[in-house]
């Protein structure tokens, strides 16, 4: 569809497949830390049902079901995306189609369940960095399979400490900063992240503050997902030669599938 023939549209935000389970675990985590339960957005005092959350998108006039796909920083096009799974011999096992504005990680769950049902003998799953999320790592590991993932570059500013510079202390449930000062637990938010906050009085005179935070309150906040242990386990697998070699097979398997689709079946735009 022509990307110039579009119109603004208000659409309902689709709930994530794991949202119910995440909400339950957030409630348990808050109770464990003696925090009040989060208010349910659907329960108001006047008992009036809350309308579903919506978002504003650019919708194609020609094909309203497709989505605006962003390729890189400047290129975009109305399109569909195909999330595809194949085996080590390059045979396609299954796929799911979705609008171009749906992130790959959202579509993964349905595809993984379909492949798992057809091929229960599967032992490992190689995915790229776009699928490296706590929910996906949890789903793969709890199914008894091994996730084979790549290194993912820290999303922090140049010159600032990376997330791995802040070490989590499981025994005391706190985070230690590069200056060996503790960041105490503060709360667990709706997205499933525990927030750890530093002592502003200590940070104010810290010699490393310019590399740590630009906060006017002189306070560093580090987020840690309640499913972070699954991410850490995936990192352990990443350093294992057996699973590192499995990930390297992507270049000659699924990448070949995409190359054939683009070159031989006119799927390149």
Task: Give residue ranges: language-model regions.
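Anion-binding and metal-coordination hotspots
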Residues: 1-269
